[in-house]
Amino acid sequence: MSKVPRNFRLLEELEKGEKGFGPESCSYGLADSDDITMTKWNGTILGPPHSNHENRIYSLSIDCGPNYPDSPPKVTFISKINLPCVNPTTGEVQTDFHTLRDWKRAYTMETLLLDLRKEMATPANKKLRQPKEGETF
C-alpha cells in the first residue's frame, strides 16, 4: 500500500476540521489560511464533564513539521493547564505522552486532541487543581 503524500493528508485533515465532521469536543484548523506548507495549526479542546476541566475551552498550537504524518506534530497548550504530560513552564505536550511516544502514521491531529481530552478525564488527572480560566503560557 502506498503512502499518501503529506500535503494530501493535511488537506484531508483540513477539510474534516473545517467542515466539523469530527467530534464536538475538539476542533482544529490552519492558523494562517495562506500557509501553503500547512505547518501551523490551531486546536481547541472542550474540557471533559465531571472534571476540573468541565466547561473550559483549551487552545493549543500544533506544528506539523516536514515529516508529518510519519513523525508526530509538536503540540503546545496556549491555555494554561495542569497535566503531568504538559510542561508547566512552556505548555508543550511532552514527547513521552503515549500518543506522541507511540505515534503511528494513521494517527491524526484529531486523534491527538481526543487523547489529550481523555487524559484530562482520567481519575488521576480529573481532580488536579487548575490555573484560573483564561490564563495562558
Swiss-Prot record:
Residues carrying Phosphoserine: 71
CDD domains: UEV_UBE2V
Molecular-function GO terms, alphabetical: ligase activity
Documented effect of changing residue 8 to A: Strongly reduces UBC13 binding and interferes with error-free DNA repair
GO biological process: free ubiquitin chain polymerization; postreplication repair; protein K63-linked ubiquitination; protein polyubiquitination; protein targeting to vacuolar membrane
The keyword Zinc belongs to this UniProt entry's keyword annotation: no
SUPFAM superfamilies in alphabetical order: UBC-like
Keyword set, alphabetical order: Ligase, Phosphoprotein, Ubl conjugation pathway
All residue ranges annotated as the UBC core domain in the record: 5-137
A single GO cellular-component term on record: cytosol
Coiled coil: none
Annotated Gene3D superfamilies: Ubiquitin Conjugating Enzyme
Keyword Ligase: yes
Xref: InterPro entries: UBQ-conjugat_E2_core, UBQ-conjugating_enzyme/RWD
Similarity comment: family membership: Belongs to the ubiquitin-conjugating enzyme family.
Additional free-text comment from the UniProt record: Present with 2760 molecules/cell in log phase SD medium.
Assembly information from the UniProt record: Heterodimer with UBC13.
Function: Has a role in the DNA error-free postreplication repair (PRR) pathway. Lacks catalytic activity by itself. The UBC13/MMS2 heterodimer catalyzes the synthesis of non-canonical poly-ubiquitin chains that are linked through 'Lys-63'.
Protein name in the entry: Ubiquitin-conjugating enzyme variant MMS2
Gene this chain is encoded by: MMS2
